[in-house]
């Protein structure tokens, strides 16, 4: 009402002029905020990126699994390669001994002893250990009792080894065949 025109209008009985309130239009809102469609497109792009990353990670996991299985398969296939190479020298020595036309018992025996040393060396290099438990306490994990005999030794002591056993590292390859003392 401080405006003189408004004062005149009020005196004349005219209604005062109200200044219209300008509301922002939808176009003005879209200028400042991204539209729903734009937000939706942005979220779709993010979802597609995440899906693509998931597919890549899944494929990489499958590739790693396949390569690991291939490596395991090759390890099984060629695990004995080193040991087999060591045994070839033993085979060669045996063939050479058989090829000699005139042998004496002494030369034959020394050849067999050398071949046995080669075999023992191959066993040692490949962690193949002999189990010869004579005089030891019977161990059912490493020994196989064939029978029990009367003995002056303590009960459950290995008296006789009928066949040596063998272990690879800590695993029994073949248990020793033994006779065990009954006790006093």
UniProtKB/Swiss-Prot annotation:
Keywords, sorted A to Z: Chaperone, Cytoplasm, Stress response
**InterPro entries in UniProt:** GrpE, GrpE_coiled_coil, GrpE_head
Q: Where in the cell is it found?
A: Cytoplasm
Record GO terms (molecular function): adenyl-nucleotide exchange factor activity; protein homodimerization activity; protein-folding chaperone binding; unfolded protein binding
GO CC aspect terms: cytosol
Q: Would the keyword Chaperone turn up in this protein's UniProt record?
A: yes
Principal subcellular localization: cytoplasm
Q: Report the function annotation for this chain.
A: Participates actively in the response to hyperosmotic and heat shock by preventing the aggregation of stress-denatured proteins, in association with DnaK and GrpE. It is the nucleotide exchange factor for DnaK and may function as a thermosensor. Unfolded proteins bind initially to DnaJ; upon interaction with the DnaJ-bound protein, DnaK hydrolyzes its bound ATP, resulting in the formation of a stable complex. GrpE releases ADP from DnaK; ATP binding to DnaK triggers the release of the substrate protein, thus completing the reaction cycle.
**PANTHER family assigned:** GRPE PROTEIN (PTHR21237), GRPE PROTEIN HOMOLOG, MITOCHONDRIAL (PTHR21237:SF23)
Question: This protein is called what?
Answer: Protein GrpE
**What is the species listed in this Swiss-Prot or TrEMBL entry?**
Dechloromonas aromatica (strain RCB)
The coding gene here is grpE
């Amino acid at each position: 009402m401080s405006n003189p025109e408004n004062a005149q209008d009020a005196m004349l009985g005219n209604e005062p002029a109200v200044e219209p309130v300008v509301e922002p239009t939808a176009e003005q809102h879209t200028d400042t905020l991204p539209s729903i469609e734009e937000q939706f497109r942005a979220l779709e792009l993010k979802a597609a990126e995440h899906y693509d990353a998931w597919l890549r990670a899944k494929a990489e996991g499958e590739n790693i699994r396949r390569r690991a299985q291939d490596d395991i398969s090759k390890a099984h296939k060629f695990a004995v390669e080193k040991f087999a190479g060591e045994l070839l020298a033993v085979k060669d020595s045996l063939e050479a001994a058989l090829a000699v036309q005139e042998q004496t018992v002494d030369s034959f025996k020394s050849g067999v002893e050398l071949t046995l040393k080669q075999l023992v060396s191959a066993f040692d290099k490949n962690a193949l250990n002999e189990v010869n438990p004579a005089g030891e306490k019977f161990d059912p994990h490493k020994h196989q009792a064939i029978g029990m005999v009367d003995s002056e030794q303590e009960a459950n002591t290995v008296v006789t080894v009928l066949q040596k056993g063998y272990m690879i590292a800590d695993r029994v390859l073949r248990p020793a065949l033994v006779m065990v003392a009954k006790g006093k």
